[in-house]
Curated annotation (Swiss-Prot):
This is UPF0145 protein CTC_01500. Pfam families: YbjQ_1 (PF01906). It comes from the Bacteria. Belongs to the UPF0145 family.
Length: 106
């Protein structure tokens, strides 16, 4: 599966199938939240939050790719990410969307 944030694939003719998306919502761990509050005081990267963002994004991408595969797509182009916190910041939601396409001649 080809994934691209561009609206084209070099030297390929594409057939548009449909818009696809992946959504993932994660809740923060209370123990990690306490440790993060200490980091807020002294500064620095909050690794547990960085890992959570990466995990949420990866899961959302996997869901989008699965939807594209179910439609018979070879690629997803024009990929966009949106992220928001919910429930007073204790929950993180990531939405990944793109256009599922079939690469002609493949």
């Amino acid at each position: 599966m080809i994934l691209s944030n561009l609206s084209y694939i070099d030297n390929k003719e594409l057939e548009t199938i449909n818009i696809v998306e992946g959504v993932c919502v994660f809740s923060k761990n209370v123990g990690k939240d306490i440790m993060a509050s200490f980091k807020n005081v002294v500064g620095g990267e909050i690794k547990s939050y960085s890992e959570m963002v990466r995990d949420v994004k990866d899961t959302a991408v996997k869901k989008m790719v699965e939807e594209a595969k179910n439609l018979g797509a070879d690629a997803v182009i024009n990929i966009r990410y949106a992220m928001t916190s919910m429930s007073q910041g204790s929950t993180l939601a990531v939405i990944v969307s793109g256009t599922a396409v079939k690469v002609k001649g493949e």
